Amino acid sequence: MQLQASLSFLLILTLCLELRSELARDTIKDLLPNVCAFPMEKGPCQTYMTRWFFNFETGECELFAYGGCGGNSNNFLRKEKCEKFCKFT
């Protein structure tokens, strides 16, 4: 009987933690500036710098050539950073 109660408690605890994690993720998405929805913008300068941006249409981080100045905040040095910041799946 105690084993069944302990297992039930662990199951409920696991479900609560998962729900809390999901709610926190949704809250973060709502609080973050909508940087990930900005269009890719290379900027006015002519330097060629490989960067990553989140393509809101495809839901993927994609490579682009950044000019070195200007642009917007949808501009990441590494694909991993882009995915960490913009992909909530």
UniProtKB/Swiss-Prot annotation:
It is found in: Secreted. Disulfide bonds join 36-86, 45-69, 61-82. GO terms for molecular function: serine-type endopeptidase inhibitor activity. Its main location: secreted. Residues 1-24 form the signal peptide. It comes from the Eukaryota. Residues 36-86 form the BPTI/Kunitz inhibitor domain. InterPro entries: Kunitz_BPTI (IPR002223), Kunitz_BPTI_sf (IPR036880), Prtase_inh_Kunz-CS (IPR020901), TFPI/VKTCI-like (IPR050098). GO terms for cellular component: extracellular region. The keyword Nucleus does not apply. Keywords: Disulfide bond, Protease inhibitor, Secreted, Serine protease inhibitor, Signal. The keyword Secreted applies. This is Kunitz-type protease inhibitor 3. It comes from Homo sapiens (Human).
